[in-house]
Amino acid sequence: MEGCCMQLPTNVSSLRGTIEVPGDKSISHRAVMLGALASGRTVIDHFLPGADCLSTIDCFRKLGVDIHQDGTNVIVEGAGSGGLREPAAVLDVGNSGTTARLLLGILAGQPFHACLVGDESIAQRPMARVTKPLREMGAHIDGRDDGNYTPLAIRGGALRPLRYTSPVASAQVKSAILLAGLFTDGVTSVTEPHRSRDHTERMIRLFGGEVNVDGLTVSIAGPQSLRGTHIYVPGDISSAAFFLVAGAIVPNSEITLKNVGLNPTRTGIIDVLERMGADITIDHIRNEETEPIGDITIRTSTLHAIEIGGDIIPRLIDEIPIIALLATQAEGTTIIKDASELKVKETNRIDTVVAELKKFGADIEATDDGMIIRGKTALYADGIVVDSHGDHRIGMMLAIAACCAKGTARLERPEAVAVSYPAFFADLRSLL
């Protein structure tokens, strides 16, 4: 499929059915990483076999960890404390910012040298937000623009504890520092301006570690040793978001999504749908290990515009592209603000979302830190060609936009969706 142009479903009269979205990308990454650091075996069920998470597996294999992956099932034979080996080859994170930033935190605590590279997109994403605090802890990191961009060379070991106030609410920054803290003698803490997703904190506890949370400050007392465990990875709410929006805006639709992760640091998309007036219900809420999960049903809804900003942004930052599409089908003017972090994702998602949705006739404009969307707008696809720009979330958003549009549309670089949702197009077809 790479490099081709895919015909998208348009003129869709309804979407109906039940699907189970793939495992959560954030949790899948962390499960492999902590399993690699733990003593003993870790068994991961419902792992996401997307390109990003496979990059994480590849990197830890190069660090000497025995990992067996068969589809959505993964077994990690943990290396234990001090068990990682100096890699003979460069560590290629591919397109995965999570792999890059969290791996830097782990490597900071290792008494050896490693080189980290990625694809063209990663080479443009800022790493100083992670390399700066890790350098303050004592890690030696060199790279382009004083360590702000890959390729990066790192030599770790002999870290000092750090009390760090992060300028951004970023789970990747927080996690990198906490992971380095596992190898540090003393208490290391991170204070954020807003609460970011907390999968790392929950998972460290699942592996037998201790993490303290006090308001916006998370701290860890090191060094700590982890024990292998069993993990069921919930369905990724960021992947579910595309079908939640599709169910709300495509006529005559009803979609049920099974076993979706409902971590409260990730459910901003549900809050937005409810505030806009969506017909949404959540059933069978229960806990799997440390994460809440449930089944979500969404039906075609009459929506109204809202303002989105402030504390909710870290809880839905990855969902903003599909929320922008949602807003085109809501009556009134929706304002998305405080989301400048979108500029340093796989693409500049502010500019990319605006440019691509305008091809469908959306009334949308970019701002310095978000977007303004005026609805409700009929979407048209007069033989248009839209482009994922190699960004998985842009590609999936455009496929849902096409479902609402009259005419015909094709998508360039559809293969990008495999980063987080390899079966996305198959699941979409199953609802037609």
UniProtKB/Swiss-Prot annotation:
Coiled coil: none annotated. Signal peptide: none annotated. Belongs to the EPSP synthase family. GO terms for biological process: amino acid biosynthetic process; aromatic amino acid family biosynthetic process; chorismate biosynthetic process. Phosphoenolpyruvate binds at K25, G97, R125, Q172, R349, R393. Its main location: cytoplasm. Keywords: Amino-acid biosynthesis, Aromatic amino acid biosynthesis, Cytoplasm, Transferase. One of its GO terms (cellular component) is cytoplasm. Monomer. SUPFAM superfamilies: EPT/RTPC-like (SSF55205). Pathway: Metabolic intermediate biosynthesis; chorismate biosynthesis; chorismate from D-erythrose 4-phosphate and phosphoenolpyruvate: step 6/7. It catalyses: 3-phosphoshikimate + phosphoenolpyruvate = 5-O-(1-carboxyvinyl)-3-phosphoshikimate + phosphate. It comes from Geobacillus thermodenitrificans (strain NG80-2). This is 3-phosphoshikimate 1-carboxyvinyltransferase. Its EC number is 2.5.1.19. NCBIfam families: aroA. CDD domains: EPSP_synthase. One of its GO terms (molecular function) is 3-phosphoshikimate 1-carboxyvinyltransferase activity. It comes from the Bacteria. InterPro entries: Enolpyruvate_Tfrase_dom, Enolpyruvate_Tfrase_sf, EPSP_synthase, EPSP_synthase_CS, RNA3'P_cycl/enolpyr_Trfase_a/b. It is found in: Cytoplasm.
